[in-house]
């Protein structure tokens, strides 16, 4: 990941979620928060499916880090990530398929 003219390596398994803010992304990991100038779509090219799931137009989550679902939000550590209405069913199906949640 490129950040302030530096290249930084981030372990994919440590990423909790990626949040888009216009042309910037925030990559929240277990140990740090990095900000990079890149559209979310470009970052998603490097994140393997089905581990990483887009759950909202502004959020991609690491499905292995989901602890709970509370209404229309996913709980990952102390963070609550919104689930878009139009992506709700696909999100649940993906989590079920990977045996990360049960009905």
PLM regions with names:
Residues 1-76:
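Conserved binding/recognition cores within well-folded domains
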Residues 1-6, 79, 85-103:
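Eukaryotic intrinsically disordered, low-complexity regulatory linkers and tails enriched in Ser/Thr/Pro
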């Amino acid at each position: 990941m490129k950040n302030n003219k530096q290249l930084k390596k981030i372990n994919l398994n440590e990423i909790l979620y990626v949040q888009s803010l216009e042309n910037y992304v925030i990559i929240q990991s277990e140990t740090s928060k990095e900000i990079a100038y890149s559209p979310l779509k470009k970052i998603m090219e490097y994140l393997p499916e089905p581990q990483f799931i887009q759950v909202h137009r502004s959020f991609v989550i690491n499905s292995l880090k989901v602890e709970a679902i509370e209404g229309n939000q996913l709980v990952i550590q102390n963070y609550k990530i919104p689930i878009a209405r139009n992506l709700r069913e696909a999100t649940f199906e993906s989590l079920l398929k990977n045996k990360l949640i049960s009905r």
